[in-house]
Amino acid sequence: MHYTVYLAGEIHTSWRTELAQQAAAAKLPVSFLGPVTDHAASDDTGAEILGAETDPFWHDRKGAGLNALRTRTMLDQADLVIVRFGDKYRQWNAAFDAGLAVATQKPLIVIHSPELQHALKEIDAAACAVAETTSQVVEILGYISRQEDWTTA
């Protein structure tokens, strides 16, 4: 079975690239979707496409609307969602994406360091799995992709 996986969460490290490379090396039947990870491009896209704003609220609102269009469309296409919480920034978007995944019945895998366990306990409780590394996630993807041959005894 092939899985389409939405990669949500922090955009300040290369975790998506690491995960995709590890999955490719393991020859897993997965493809990945995700947000625009260029922070400035993500923030400014609404004003660039729909017109400049002098009020920062409306500048951000236009960008958020276009990013929500992308996120919701891709979440709908995904078979499962992986959300990574980093240690450096408060990640409201990551928490929101995790909530959307759960609300739309998408299986959720969460990645974060042990230091965030208490802060993320409710999100962790809603997840199917909580990992600390991309390697653990690749092992999970390998397990759920495993094919059994019941024709031989």
Segments and roles (model prediction):
Residues 1-153:
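Conserved catalytic or regulatory cores that recognize and/or transform ribose-phosphate-containing ligands
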